[in-house]
Amino acid sequence: SGGKKIKVDKPLGLGGGLTVDIDA
């Protein structure tokens, strides 16, 4: 991949973690 990983804790207060792996 070689992209960047974005770690977001409780996005928009959904009560959960979100890990987005962008292949840029």
UniProtKB/Swiss-Prot annotation:
GO cellular component, one term: chloroplast thylakoid membrane
UniProt KW keywords: Chloroplast, Membrane, Photosynthesis, Photosystem II, Plastid, Thylakoid
Record localization: Plastid, Chloroplast thylakoid membrane
Keyword Disulfide bond (UniProt): no
KW Nuclease (keyword) present: no
Record GO biological process: photosynthesis
Recorded superkingdom: Eukaryota
Protein family according to the UniProt entry: Belongs to the psbR family.
Function recorded in the entry: Associated with the oxygen-evolving complex of photosystem II.
Protein name from the UniProt record: Photosystem II 10 kDa polypeptide
Source organism per UniProt: Triticum aestivum
Source species taxonomy: Eukaryota, Viridiplantae, Streptophyta, Embryophyta, Tracheophyta
Encoding gene (name): PSBR
